[in-house]
């Protein structure tokens, strides 16, 4: 399971979606980043899977 979360430039959550397929999650992440500016995908345990766009400063630096 992969959860993709989209954020606006202020770091506010705009949309979130869960996918079972890793490739579908990657495509969703790219689509959401184009709509909102930044999106990231995490796995079932909250580990970073991928992101697209410019990470808002309000979210802080991502720890991998």
Predicted regions: what they are:
Residues 11-23:
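A short, exposed loop/beta-hairpin motif centered on an aromatic-Gly-Thr core
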Residues 34-64:
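Short, mixed-charge low-complexity intrinsically disordered segments
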Residues 1-14, 43:
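Short aromatic-glycine-(Arg/Gly/Cys) micro-motifs in beta-strand/loop hairpins
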Residues 8, 26-27, 41, 60:
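Short stretches within intrinsically disordered, low-complexity N-terminal or propeptide regions
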């Amino acid at each position: 399971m992969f959860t993709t979360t989209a954020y606006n430039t202020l770091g506010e959550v705009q949309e979130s979606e869960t996918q079972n397929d890793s490739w579908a999650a990657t495509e969703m992440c790219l689509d959401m980043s184009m709509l909102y500016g930044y999106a990231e995908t995490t796995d079932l345990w909250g580990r970073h899977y991928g992101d697209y766009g410019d990470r808002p400063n309000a979210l802080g630096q991502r720890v991998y």
